[in-house]
């Protein structure tokens, strides 16, 4: 069995940084790079891509709503499908250009924050993201939340997909992520998270906040770089997987 560990990195801006990207880069096998709208800037993007290349880590675009102040975690009411297509294509293109400069290659796309959360439950948003990816490069892999509207959109667009589960986030009974506004939405105990991810990988299932077992295809596991204790969490997850004979490797080769 093989599984990928992905992490959202490059989420600083100017002199401000978030998380320990250097440490996470040594543990993750794929990283999703902020493209300047919710976080990131040209210098941080280049530094992140160059670091990924040096560690043999695959890179993907991590487009979000244009909301630096809110870190892309606030919905944008009234946004149109065309506007979503434009902002996603713009951000993918930005990372592709920076990656070319750094001698690396973008292999996948994963929507960030509110853009992803809305798309998981809204057909229009999900299809707009998929349409933008297909228009920019139909060979890009679409990272989708398992069992969500993103899966349907990716299938309709004919995109290759990787199904994602989250190590450090709680799930609702319908398979969607618990809102960060709710208590218990973000998990922090490395031992609990490692055991949880091992079950996800072995059983192809997650357990919701109420204890419901939800079957989910598990190709890649996300660990948020901005979660408190992220490095310890990531290290614990990788150690648990490998100790149980599961190969940790990128889903794409750049």
Curated annotation (Swiss-Prot):
Keywords: ATP-binding, Hydrolase, Nucleotide-binding. It is an enzyme of class 3 (hydrolase). Pfam families: LamB_YcsF. GO terms for biological process: carbohydrate metabolic process. It catalyses: 5-oxo-L-proline + ATP + 2 H2O = L-glutamate + ADP + phosphate + H(+). SUPFAM superfamilies: Glycoside hydrolase/deacetylase (SSF88713). InterPro entries: Glyco_hydro/deAcase_b/a-brl, LamB/YcsF/PxpA-like. GO terms for molecular function: 5-oxoprolinase (ATP-hydrolyzing) activity; ATP binding. Its EC number is 3.5.2.9. NCBIfam families: PRK05406.1-3, PRK05406.1-5. PANTHER family: 5-OXOPROLINASE SUBUNIT A, UNCHARACTERIZED PROTEIN YBGL-RELATED. Forms a complex composed of PxpA, PxpB and PxpC. Belongs to the LamB/PxpA family. Catalyzes the cleavage of 5-oxoproline to form L-glutamate coupled to the hydrolysis of ATP to ADP and inorganic phosphate. This is 5-oxoprolinase subunit A. The gene is pxpA.
